[in-house]
Amino acid sequence: MIKTYRIYTTLLFALIQNIAMAGDLPDINLTPGSINASINQSNIQSTICVKGYTKIVRPPVYFTNSLKKKQMRDYGYADINPAHYEEDHLIPLSIGGNPSDPANLWPQARLSEWNAEKKDILEFKLYKLVCEGAVTLDDARHQISTNWIETYKRYVK
């Protein structure tokens, strides 16, 4: 019984280490971010700020699931369970990120402190600030693509 417990503990520890290896920020060489060039400050009220905009431009699940598996290999993640990641847009669709350019997508860990759910909170906050005119579109895009964690700390906490 104790031996089994030790094996499970060792396996759990190894899994946690592997998940942490995914990193909380994307590799800028693989995922530098990419914008939708048709979205700019002058047209946000008729594009990204319109309810339902992201549903129109979001790529299909079969595309993102396939890309996620490829990018998990490209990133060299030790944990290769796709369910542990969300294929996330570095520059979110809600602030005019490119929907289908692999340079704007990466497999973001779900099981870390700085996970996909936290980034979603930041994405909504930036969307509101941009649409209210409190932050420019370019500034929001730059901040989230440079270091989304620091941007989260600035605007959410």
Model-derived regions, located:
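Nuclease and nuclease-like effector domains acting on nucleic acids or nucleotide cofactors
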Residues: I2-Y85, S94-K157
